[in-house]
């Protein structure tokens, strides 16, 4: 376990999965602590796929491969390759075992950098092979609802960087998406209220680059945590449908998503697949912002 700190935040990261374990400010924990009653993870890195492939199988170059939900990186031990007080970098390379599930030699680097009240999470994917590589990558951090009280129905609000209603898709019981598109209507203040029934649909998947920032507000509409990202998709998930007393929500920037129901095509033709030519690299990042440090810089949408 490695610890990063500055004058505002203290962050802990595990080598297993290169996964965030803790985000504290003034001794207060912001990152979900992985109680298995609800969900045993905290902030897994999703690679080399996001979500599920149909029937847990996919096809590439005439062969069929089996891979589980969200890939395997989250369950592997990374190596620490760089460390200072405010930053750390972890790396993972393909092995004979991973090549049996994902037939591409790769290197994955995951970096964390503290700057004031922000944590920048950086990913680099390198294609070490001689053929084009097809992959997806995503984040799955979980955060405590502010001022959580299981005896009440309300959990807070989301505010987005756009004021208009949003389109979303959602997974079926088998974890793959159906073609139906749905509209998320925001309230008169441009907010998405969160209560114990908000996630009866399980997951909201916003695609087509609709969003670049999501902020979780407390019940008084004060900013608590924000995520900034450039990913083409972002998901919101909380298991409150099966666990109404669940105290957390996930905000998940994705470069890819699960299969559509019944998909039987090739890996390279999956929706939102990423492609790397031999020796190319893929570099992206997202930011976690502890907004409760200051409420002065975030402007809520005006009434529409």
Where are these regions (language model features)?
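Short Pro-Gly-centered flexible turn/kink motifs
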Residues: 13, 58-66, 123, 274-291
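Conserved small/polar residues in nucleotide/adenosyl-binding loops
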Residues: 295-302
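Active-site/ligand-binding surface loops and adjacent short beta/alpha elements
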Residues: 145, 149-230
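Extended, loop-rich substrate-binding clefts of extracytoplasmic carbohydrate-active enzymes
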Residues: 63-116
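Beta-strand-rich interaction surfaces with strong enrichment in secreted/lumenal proteins
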Residues: 109-111, 271-275
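Acidic, contiguous internal or C-terminal segments within carbohydrate-active enzymes
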Residues: 4, 96-147
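Acidic-aromatic substrate-binding/catalytic surfaces of carbohydrate-active enzymes
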Residues: 7-64
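Acidic/His-leaning functional-site neighborhoods
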Residues: 9, 25, 65, 70, ...
């Amino acid at each position: 376990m490695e610890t990063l700190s500055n004058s505002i935040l203290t962050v802990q990261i595990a080598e297993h999965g290169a996964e965030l374990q803790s985000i504290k400010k003034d001794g207060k924990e912001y990152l979900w602590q992985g109680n298995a009653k609800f969900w045993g993870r905290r902030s897994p890195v999703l690679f080399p796929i996001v979500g599920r492939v149909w029937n847990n199988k996919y096809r590439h170059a005439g062969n069929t491969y089996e891979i589980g939900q969200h890939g395997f990186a989250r369950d592997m031990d990374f190596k620490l390759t760089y460390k200072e007080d405010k930053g750390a970098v972890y790396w993972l390379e393909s092995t004979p075992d991973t090549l049996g599930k994902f037939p591409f030699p790769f290197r994955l680097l995951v970096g964390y950098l503290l700057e004031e009240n922000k944590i920048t999470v950086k990913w680099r994917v390198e294609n070490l092979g001689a053929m084009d590589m097809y992959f997806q990558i995503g984040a799955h951090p979980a955060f405590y609802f502010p001022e959580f009280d299981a005896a009440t129905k309300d959990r807070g609000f989301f505010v987005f960087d756009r004021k208009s209603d949003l389109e979303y898709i959602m997974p079926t019981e088998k974890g793959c998406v159906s073609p139906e598109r749905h509209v998320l209507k925001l309230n008169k203040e441009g907010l998405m209220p969160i209560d114990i029934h908000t996630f009866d649909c399980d997951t909201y998947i916003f695609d087509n680059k609709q969003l670049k920032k999501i902020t979780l507000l407390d019940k008084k509409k004060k900013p608590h945590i924000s995520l900034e990202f450039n990913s083409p998709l972002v998901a919101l998930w909380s298991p409150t449908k099966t666990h109404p007393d669940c105290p957390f929500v996930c905000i998940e920037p994705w470069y890819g998503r699960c299969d559509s129901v019944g998909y039987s095509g090739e890996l390279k033709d999956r929706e939102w697949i990423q492609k790397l030519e031999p020796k190319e690299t893929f570099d992206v990042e997202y930011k976690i912002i502890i907004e409760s440090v200051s409420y002065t810089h975030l402007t809520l949408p005006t009434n529409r």
